[in-house]
């Protein structure tokens, strides 16, 4: 067996499949593009769905890749097991309607066992297969596999909802009896017992059926094109090749672990408890790659995942004695390890470090708040003479403050308390169920559309013409090809078309189709790309259409022109964003419509009004310079040498289209554009907002719509000026400032009057002192405008020795507000309010001397006041 580095293993995989005529598909971004069913790219096949469902036909039906992926469903196992990771690489080879079972198994065995390639010992390999899949069993036997190494497993059938499915055969590497202390042997595989002896290194999915959840598996229809979909975990394969005890002892992780040793002063012991080292090493890989691919920490979606990973890593750093920001210092090491295939981490190192460090610094403040909460919880337990920290509180520490359960348990035990593991798991399960309920349903590859996939007639798009004559090649109605049509809605393919198919964020052209007499026979309402690249025109039929006949196609010129204004302006906006807020502001989505443009980009905070002003001004400067817009077609390498910006998540072929706006903007783009920036007229930003963690959106308008937006603002300003009786609009600001000054004076006077009134009221309330069990208390309902007035009462109460305890209740709007203050060491205000608040259907808490609660049942206020004595 060869000793190979991780880079060599990855490259050997790609080289082998390239030798079998596979095209190497570059690794896609971790953030999915145009796939709402996925939070992350989570497998090697995730980016190839379009090929397997037939919506796009690949240039080469044989594909191989090394794809970075993120999965966080087993985050709690990371660091505990030898092979769980949040970020990993999946090596794959794929056949889209080309070779099938025979070649997949034969070539797979060759790659693993040939001395030219991985050279793994044949007697160390075991395979599982679906019991009904006798063909796979026979292929393995033909390869020379011992029958005792072939294990039938009922679960070896791959399907996720509707779409491609089929049996799979998994390959395992036997690491020997050192990893099988109970000497169970192959039964570990046959009975699916969790173990470290038999390591799954590869899964070959034989996709031959269109799964239909409505029928039994035996009734699944055969796919028109059978596929191969495989996945081999790089980390596991490297661990096998390097003879490592766990994945973490390979060259993918050990350099990171060595850096953690330097930062912590602790030593990694392969045979000891190294969970914190492993968690940090794993999580910083995920953070580095995800942030580099445009995701940013936040409170929802993938941003929440990153924040959780970072906080978990920070807490494990603290367990190692690292109490200052340190994760950002590991980013260069991650970049160097992966540089040979993933240079993007080092290329974006400064930005990634900045985001990680900033998030660490923010979390440092949160940790203090969480520590204070834990201290309070433990103090409350002690006061209540309880010995167990409740599961819901452990979960709140975990979910809100990022405290790992192990750390909470350790701190609680140090203080003499146990923790409620069962309650924590119940709270965790509730959250997971809520998360699953919020996930967009989907994820299967979709049913193959054979009719569209089988369109082979050539069709070209003519950028230069807005009208032309062209022969009708294909008519599709109700998913069937027909020769003629005279009514309804159908799909058409022409040999040549001036109609732009929706793509790259630009909406499709609309227009008319006419016969040789000039009569309109169809209205084009949409244009989309067919699997083989043809333009599919969706039309409302108004006359007679027949295959083989030539028709006159003309687009809606005004619509196209308005869309082009917005598309060219989008390129200017993208460049301006880079210049004003930084190169990290990469495109995360765009829409070039008729009436507006929408641009999504990665950024970690709201764009300030001043920055928006600069961006808007810079775009308009480029418009007024009347810069020519040029387009050329060239190969991808030449385009990169020109400095062309490749858009986020896009895949490009060998030949690309480069759109240049002078030297201000150079982008790869297949859309339609103006000839000169001056044609845009004017550009105006109408809105900037956050649409998700780390993603901002700008909505803007151009030309006529921009003029109308400015006119609308002017009309509003005139109306305000009239209301304020300002003769000139430039006097509006001064008038508003004057009104604000008057308002502040009135508010101050009002506050002073309230304070005087409160003092008078307090004098009456503080006279009503009662006593129980030797404690003097005041309990009263008061009439106040807001909860702040309750605190004012409490402040006055503290100034003199009126009583030991104060309880005030106020009904404000639809809410009941309760305040408890205590001067007695025997009465904890926070505990007392927890007992009283439920009476008014509320909840609350606080410190020993002051606590507040909110409720909703005003009818129970008298009951709450009466209950004060019972709880003292």
UniProtKB/Swiss-Prot annotation:
One Gene Ontology cellular component term attached to this UniProt record is: cytosol
Q: Which cofactor does it need?
A: Zn(2+)
Any Pfam family matching the protein: tRNA_SAD
The parts of the chain that form a coiled coil are none
Q: Which reaction does it catalyse?
A: tRNA(Ala) + L-alanine + ATP = L-alanyl-tRNA(Ala) + AMP + diphosphate
Compartment(s) of residence: Cytoplasm
Q: What InterPro entries does the annotation carry?
A: aa-tRNA-synth_II/BPL/LPL, Ala-tRNA-lgiase_IIc, Ala-tRNA-ligase_IIc_anticod-bd, Ala-tRNA-synth_IIc_core, Ala-tRNA-synth_IIc_N, Ala-tRNA_ligase, Ala_tRNA_ligase_euk/bac, DHHA1_dom
- Identify the Gene3D superfamilies for this entry: 2.40.30.130, 3.10.310.40, 3.30.54.20, 6.10.250.550, Bira Bifunctional Protein, Domain 2 (3.30.930.10), Threonyl-trna Synthetase, Chain A, domain 2 (3.30.980.10)
> GO biological process: any one?
alanyl-tRNA aminoacylation
Does RNA-binding show up as a keyword for this record? Answer: yes
Q: Locate the residues binding Zn(2+).
A: 567, 571, 669, 673
Q: What is its EC number?
A: 6.1.1.7
Name the keywords, alphabetized.
Answer: Aminoacyl-tRNA synthetase, ATP-binding, Cytoplasm, Ligase, Metal-binding, Nucleotide-binding, Protein biosynthesis, RNA-binding, tRNA-binding, Zinc
Q: What GO MF annotations does this protein's record show?
A: alanine-tRNA ligase activity; aminoacyl-tRNA deacylase activity; ATP binding; catalytic activity, acting on a protein; transferase activity; tRNA binding; zinc ion binding
Determine if Metal-binding is one of this entry's keywords: yes
Cofactor note as given: Binds 1 zinc ion per subunit.
- Which protein family is named in the record? Belongs to the class-II aminoacyl-tRNA synthetase family.
Protein role: Catalyzes the attachment of alanine to tRNA(Ala) in a two-step reaction: alanine is first activated by ATP to form Ala-AMP and then transferred to the acceptor end of tRNA(Ala). Also edits incorrectly charged Ser-tRNA(Ala) and Gly-tRNA(Ala) via its editing domain.
Reproduce the free-text note on domains from the UniProt record. Consists of three domains; the N-terminal catalytic domain, the editing domain and the C-terminal C-Ala domain. The editing domain removes incorrectly charged amino acids, while the C-Ala domain, along with tRNA(Ala), serves as a bridge to cooperatively bring together the editing and aminoacylation centers thus stimulating deacylation of misacylated tRNAs.
This protein's name: Alanine--tRNA ligase
List the source organism: Streptococcus mutans serotype c (strain ATCC 700610 / UA159)
Protein's gene: alaS
